Amino acid sequence: MSATSPAAVVVLAAGEGTRMKSKTPKVLHEISGRSLVGHVVAAARELDPQHLVVVVGHAREQVTAHLDAGDAPVRTAFQAEQNGTGHAVRMGLEELGGAVEGTVIVVCGDTPLLSGTTLGALAATHAADANAVTVLSAEVPDSTGYGRIVRDPATGAVTEIVEHKDATDEQRAIREINSGVFAFDGRLLGDALGKVRTDNSQGEEYLTDVLSILREAGHRVGACVAGDHREILGINNRLQLAEARRLLNERLLERAMLAGVTVVDPASTLIDATVTYERDAVVHPGTQLLGTTHLAEDSEVGPNARIENTAVGAGARVDNSVTLSAEIGAGALVGPYAYLRPGTRLGTKAKAGTYVEMKNATIGEGTKVPHLSYVGDATIGDHTNIGAASVFVNYDGVAKHHTTIGSHCRTGSDNMFVAPVTVGDGVYTAAGSVITKDVPAGSLAVARGQQRNIEGWVARKRPGSAAAQAAQASSQETDGQS
């Protein structure tokens, strides 16, 4: 913990979010690879607080399970009845044992654009000004629906926050709004919450009333104005969800470009907050970078690629393809129109070419699967070439089975490898073969019916047809040349 690290961060995530018109709790809707509350928790963790608690209510089990499945455990408190933000914070403090020594930051769980940097500035301002409470505020073009920051005309000090429904016409003209994010002196917060009343239009305990209570008790109330008002955007409907996704995507792409990644067309590129990259990676238009994807130095992806939970090696190329939970080695080539499913590991300078699908397959260094093939549940050695239109037949109707092909093999076009089967090193297979038995190293495997030509069949069985006429003309031409 640093000198300005808060003692506790309380995240409010108990509301239902009826305006989302969804069976999914509002805070679990996702943008840029994380849920709304997941983004808030990630920002809060940047402050390295001693305690982090999320107050849950609506769909308690679902939200708690989501939080438990995250990168690190999150403590939760339960607000059984939705009695307002003040009541929610009381539930959070009770989970922490009551009064907290030090700074307590309260943040809403539906503000995914809020950055750790802004939260850090709030904590620093709170400590430097020795405030009892510091509100994170913002100047916005349209303050409709937000609580207004009311200041003393003479001193500029914050006197109260008035909710939109309770504001006068004069107060509704104020453009400085409450973000719903606060820093409190933990020693004073608990007592002040106990004095909050419910005589307002909603009949709820407003957390904002704590400001007036503390100010009237002679304590200092301050504000920290956010540098970018868009950070405090709260999500209440699908329109705001889409806007937040757009803004966050722009921020993430800007960060990537400043780190040395070339993004050819940011407007058509999507990136998740969990994606990592190295300098001189190139992202072409229409590309989605999702999940825990990593782009190594000099890698190149797109156009029109979906790269999800995939490690793309240095200098590798992915063109017009989909990769899911795959590993692509340095200098490897994927696509166009390839599909790498989970468990695919493509070796250094290997190739999964046009219309190739792979699943749970390990492909060795320099090995190529160039065209029109399915490789499932397989291990292929180094510097092997798989012929076009090959199928690794891995399913017998009950269970999946594995195929192993060695190094420096050359398999013919239109082969089928019926698992379980092992093909040794240096093997050649003939085109059209169905390989059902193991092939020893250095062998040529031929597994197809012998060709039989029945001469004159077309003339006898299809007399007068175009084929028969063409055959007759060809025969006459041949006879004339002899």
Curated annotation (Swiss-Prot):
<comment type="pathway">
    <text>Nucleotide-sugar biosynthesis; UDP-N-acetyl-alpha-D-glucosamine biosynthesis; UDP-N-acetyl-alpha-D-glucosamine from N-acetyl-alpha-D-glucosamine 1-phosphate: step 1/1.</text>
</comment>
<dbReference type="GO" id="GO:0019134">
    <property type="term" value="F:glucosamine-1-phosphate N-acetyltransferase activity"/>
</dbReference>
<dbReference type="Pfam" id="PF00132">
    <property type="entry name" value="Hexapep"/>
</dbReference>
<comment type="pathway">
    <text>Nucleotide-sugar biosynthesis; UDP-N-acetyl-alpha-D-glucosamine biosynthesis; N-acetyl-alpha-D-glucosamine 1-phosphate from alpha-D-glucosamine 6-phosphate (route II): step 2/2.</text>
</comment>
<feature type="binding site">
    <location>
        <position position="385"/>
    </location>
    <ligand>
        <name>UDP-N-acetyl-alpha-D-glucosamine</name>
    </ligand>
</feature>
<comment type="similarity">
    <text>In the C-terminal section; belongs to the transferase hexapeptide repeat family.</text>
</comment>
<dbReference type="GO" id="GO:0005737">
    <property type="term" value="C:cytoplasm"/>
</dbReference>
<dbReference type="InterPro" id="IPR038009">
    <property type="entry name" value="GlmU_C_LbH"/>
</dbReference>
<feature type="compositionally biased region" description="Low complexity">
    <location>
        <begin position="465"/>
        <end position="476"/>
    </location>
</feature>
<feature type="region of interest" description="Pyrophosphorylase">
    <location>
        <begin position="1"/>
        <end position="238"/>
    </location>
</feature>
<feature type="binding site">
    <location>
        <position position="110"/>
    </location>
    <ligand>
        <name>Mg(2+)</name>
    </ligand>
</feature>
<keyword id="KW-0808">Transferase</keyword>
<feature type="binding site">
    <location>
        <position position="236"/>
    </location>
    <ligand>
        <name>UDP-N-acetyl-alpha-D-glucosamine</name>
    </ligand>
</feature>
<dbReference type="GO" id="GO:0006048">
    <property type="term" value="P:UDP-N-acetylglucosamine biosynthetic process"/>
</dbReference>
<dbReference type="GO" id="GO:0003977">
    <property type="term" value="F:UDP-N-acetylglucosamine diphosphorylase activity"/>
</dbReference>
<dbReference type="InterPro" id="IPR005882">
    <property type="entry name" value="Bifunctional_GlmU"/>
</dbReference>
<feature type="binding site">
    <location>
        <position position="374"/>
    </location>
    <ligand>
        <name>UDP-N-acetyl-alpha-D-glucosamine</name>
    </ligand>
</feature>
<feature type="region of interest" description="Linker">
    <location>
        <begin position="239"/>
        <end position="259"/>
    </location>
</feature>
<dbReference type="InterPro" id="IPR011004">
    <property type="entry name" value="Trimer_LpxA-like_sf"/>
</dbReference>
<feature type="binding site">
    <location>
        <position position="236"/>
    </location>
    <ligand>
        <name>Mg(2+)</name>
    </ligand>
</feature>
<keyword id="KW-0511">Multifunctional enzyme</keyword>
<dbReference type="Pfam" id="PF12804">
    <property type="entry name" value="NTP_transf_3"/>
</dbReference>
<feature type="region of interest" description="N-acetyltransferase">
    <location>
        <begin position="260"/>
        <end position="482"/>
    </location>
</feature>
<feature type="region of interest" description="Disordered">
    <location>
        <begin position="458"/>
        <end position="482"/>
    </location>
</feature>
<dbReference type="GO" id="GO:0000902">
    <property type="term" value="P:cell morphogenesis"/>
</dbReference>
<feature type="binding site">
    <location>
        <position position="79"/>
    </location>
    <ligand>
        <name>UDP-N-acetyl-alpha-D-glucosamine</name>
    </ligand>
</feature>
<keyword id="KW-0961">Cell wall biogenesis/degradation</keyword>
<comment type="function">
    <text>Catalyzes the last two sequential reactions in the de novo biosynthetic pathway for UDP-N-acetylglucosamine (UDP-GlcNAc). The C-terminal domain catalyzes the transfer of acetyl group from acetyl coenzyme A to glucosamine-1-phosphate (GlcN-1-P) to produce N-acetylglucosamine-1-phosphate (GlcNAc-1-P), which is converted into UDP-GlcNAc by the transfer of uridine 5-monophosphate (from uridine 5-triphosphate), a reaction catalyzed by the N-terminal domain.</text>
</comment>
<dbReference type="GO" id="GO:0008360">
    <property type="term" value="P:regulation of cell shape"/>
</dbReference>
<keyword id="KW-0012">Acyltransferase</keyword>
<dbReference type="GO" id="GO:0071555">
    <property type="term" value="P:cell wall organization"/>
</dbReference>
<comment type="similarity">
    <text>In the N-terminal section; belongs to the N-acetylglucosamine-1-phosphate uridyltransferase family.</text>
</comment>
<dbReference type="GO" id="GO:0009252">
    <property type="term" value="P:peptidoglycan biosynthetic process"/>
</dbReference>
<keyword id="KW-0133">Cell shape</keyword>
<feature type="active site" description="Proton acceptor">
    <location>
        <position position="371"/>
    </location>
</feature>
<feature type="binding site">
    <location>
        <position position="388"/>
    </location>
    <ligand>
        <name>acetyl-CoA</name>
    </ligand>
</feature>
<dbReference type="GO" id="GO:0000287">
    <property type="term" value="F:magnesium ion binding"/>
</dbReference>
<dbReference type="GO" id="GO:0009245">
    <property type="term" value="P:lipid A biosynthetic process"/>
</dbReference>
<feature type="binding site">
    <location>
        <position position="431"/>
    </location>
    <ligand>
        <name>acetyl-CoA</name>
    </ligand>
</feature>
<protein>
    <recommendedName>
        <fullName>Bifunctional protein GlmU</fullName>
        <ecNumber>2.7.7.23</ecNumber>
        <ecNumber>2.3.1.157</ecNumber>
    </recommendedName>
</protein>
<keyword id="KW-0460">Magnesium</keyword>
<dbReference type="InterPro" id="IPR050065">
    <property type="entry name" value="GlmU-like"/>
</dbReference>
